């Protein structure tokens, strides 16, 4: 369920949870995700199959509704996984790759480097990647700033807000370069500018010169 919540956070409309309850989740071990939900109004079952498109977003490729039992829904999921006619989306949008190599080693933020290369942060990296597939880069420099000394903190904060607003059932309007977010819910629209405090030049230097403590040093301070 937690994995499905991550990949479907921006694929499903926020208010669908008011009329349905997700019950079960399935995968074929490859690119397909299945789910079963209960219709809270009609008290019957619906099921769907999701696959990734070229932008790496999961989208519905098959949906079945008005099934009277969960057993019927499970059988439909099983049958759908075994079919050869599942559509694999193919559109013109390439995926938004926050971790692509920009050959910017001199200006790269060490926290970004740690996030990209350390196995310890691999789970966080995968979650950020899933979120970024749905993020619309309005001004065209998000990836460059996300990797940079001066931009990493603010861009991480923007991704956090992007998730927070969606989890709070807001929808987004991403048609303007400013402000950072225009969100709406219940016919109310809010404009938000994300602001962080820039590091002092000497603190930026401290980041680049920072060497992580060894396990022995850490244990000695506990």
Model feature map: region roles:
Residues 165, 181-183, 190-198:
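Conserved catalytic cores of phosphodiester-cleaving nucleases, focusing on short active-site segments
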Residues 54-112, 207, 214-222:
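Mixed-charge (acidic/basic) macromolecular-recognition segments
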Residues 86-152, 203:
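Interdomain/boundary linker segments immediately adjacent to catalytic/signaling cores
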Residues 34-36, 47-49, 128, 146, ...:
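Generic structural hydrophobic/aromatic packing signal, biased to beta-strands
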Residues 137-173:
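Acidic-basic catalytic patches of nuclease active cores, encompassing PD-(D/E)XK
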Residues 1-57, 199-222:
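Metal-dependent nuclease catalytic core centered on acidic motifs
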Residues 174-185:
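Long, charged, glycine-rich C-terminal linkers/tails
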Residues 40-42, 63-68, 195-199:
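A short, sequence-level motif marking secondary-structure junctions
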